[in-house]
């Protein structure tokens, strides 16, 4: 059977971002602010990613897996247009320091309903924990103002579909998609996580891989007393990033 019992993978991911942030009560500002163009955040970032997988039982149809990556960015910019947040207008020329940090921590259980020596396809359920922090420090002629967005951790449940295909001996094609949409009281959230890549296993316990990942996350809080865990802010985050990742893999 070509499907591993367990594995640990680690490597680098070069991500390219498009992010929009909003602060405060809906209708009291200019709407979403582009974090890269207007607020000076880097549009690309190289991060370390780690993941682990284990398949209990002899059939190896059940699978538990985990992954982690941290995306921390800060920027400096001079406003090129007026922005309004909570009915306060900050003029062209104001100096803005921005912080936008988040982690993606994912755990998933899946079951392979189709598995043979060449193909493995599984369905599952996952949970994403997303520690999130974003804020602005705006300097005008009148002084400094710190505008807080959020500093919280959001749990996002997701459905998962996984596929592994043995192309030739030791060469595999892997694909996975996880997604969710949820609207509850003062919270609305959506997530799409798409991965596809090739993996070469020249030795029994060692492999290397190259893949592509796209991820889009949108979370919006409209009240500080929501029933949804972690929603203690008023604002919206809409972040999309994609890029290539290269990794090594230890299997057992």
Language model regions located:
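Extracellular/periplasm-exposed beta-strand and loop segments of Gram-negative cell-envelope proteins
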Residues: 18-46, 70-103, 130-154, 182-187, ...
């Amino acid at each position: 059977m070509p499907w591993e019992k367990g594995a640990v993978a680690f490597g680098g991911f070069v991500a390219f971002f498009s992010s929009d942030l909003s602060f405060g009560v809906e209708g009291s500002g200019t709407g979403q602010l582009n974090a890269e163009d207007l607020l000076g955040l880097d549009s690309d970032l190289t991060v370390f990613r780690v993941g682990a997988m284990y398949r209990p039982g002899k059939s190896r149809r059940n699978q538990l897996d985990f992954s982690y990556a941290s995306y921390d960015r800060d920027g400096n910019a001079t406003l090129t247009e007026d922005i309004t947040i909570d009915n306060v207008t900050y003029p062209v020329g104001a100096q803005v320091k921005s912080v936008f940090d988040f982690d993606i921590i994912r755990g998933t259980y899946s079951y392979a309903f189709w598995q043979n020596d060449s193909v493995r396809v599984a369905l599952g359920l996952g949970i994403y924990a997303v520690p999130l922090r974003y804020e602005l420090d705006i300097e005008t002629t009148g002084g400094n103002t710190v505008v807080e967005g959020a500093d919280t951790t959001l749990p996002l449940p997701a459905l998962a579909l996984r596929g592994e295909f043995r192309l030739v001996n030791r060469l595999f094609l892997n694909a996975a998609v996880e997604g969710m949409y949820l609207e509850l009281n003062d919270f609305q959230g959506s997530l799409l996580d798409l991965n596809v890549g090739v993996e070469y296993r020249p030795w029994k316990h060692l492999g290397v891989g190259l893949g592509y990942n796209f991820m889009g996350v949108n979370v919006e809080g409209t009240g500080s007393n929501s029933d949804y865990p972690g929603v203690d802010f008023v604002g919206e985050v809409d972040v999309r990033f994609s890029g290539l990742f290269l990794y090594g893999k230890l299997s057992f």
